[in-house]
């Protein structure tokens, strides 16, 4: 099912890029406050 795809999604380079982008966005927004 869907949960079987999760490890593949997490290990994908695109997910890592997206995750790092979200993380940097959150940290930058936190610094602005």
Curated annotation (Swiss-Prot):
Pfam families: Pardaxin. Keywords: Ion transport, Membrane, Secreted, Target cell membrane, Target membrane, Toxin, Transmembrane, Transport. It comes from Pardachirus pavoninus. Consists of a C-terminal hydrophilic region and a predominantly hydrophobic remainder. GO terms for molecular function: toxin activity. This is Pardaxin P-1. InterPro entries: Pardaxin. The keyword Magnesium does not apply. It comes from the Eukaryota. In aqueous solution exists as a tetramer. GO terms for cellular component: extracellular region; membrane; other organism cell membrane. It is found in: Secreted; Target cell membrane. Belongs to the pardaxin family. One of its GO terms (biological process) is monoatomic ion transport. Exhibits unusual shark repellent and surfactant properties. Forms voltage-dependent, ion-permeable channels in membranes. At high concentration causes cell membrane lysis. Causes death in killfish oryzias latipes in 30 minutes at a concentration of 25 micrograms/ml.
């Amino acid at each position: 099912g869907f949960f079987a795809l999760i490890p593949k999604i997490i290990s994908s380079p695109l997910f890592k890029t997206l995750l790092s982008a979200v993380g940097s966005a959150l940290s930058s927004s936190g610094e602005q406050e």
